[in-house]
Amino acid sequence: MKREGRKIAGVVVWDTATARVADRAGVDIVSVGDSVAMSLWGRPAEGDVSVDEMLLVCTAVARGVERALVSCDLPGGSLDGARRLVADGGAEMVKVSGEELVAAIARDGIPVLASLSGDGDAVTEARRLEAAGAAALDFRHSGEEDGRRVADAVSVPVIGGLGGGPWLDGRMRAVHRLLDDPLAAYVADVRAGRPVKGD
């Protein structure tokens, strides 16, 4: 998609029904985030989740997807965990941090969405992760200038969460963050006695 100049739209979801809605909407990547621990289960830390739990969530999400690519965060950082998410969970890509782990998983033939750490020089890190075999880069919480420099420095897509500017190759958002305005509009329509979608 980067070569074609088409931006990548991604959403983070944790269940079959939402995955189905995202897939029908034309999302390119449905990402199963380890944020499930905090956002869905109310745990105190975002990464407080096991491979077995991610496997369960990934399987549910994959059941709702017919077209989009399913990516899954890999807790624990093991090659065996990545293999399980692909073989048993329906993931087509895994998201990890760290050059060595990216290289090990990529050598095994599994596409990797590699997270930039945000420590040090982002361009150098991005080039190293691409050289290690990353199929795409996750660059969150970046400024616009850093986003442009990283996107220009590598041939793989650079997908941003918060920040990064229009130069990034795509965006990833947790689906619940996209619901604020539509949900508020729904409440306003109901209270005003107006028809709502689905009536």
Regions of interest found by a model, annotated:
Residues 1-199:
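Alpha/beta enzyme core
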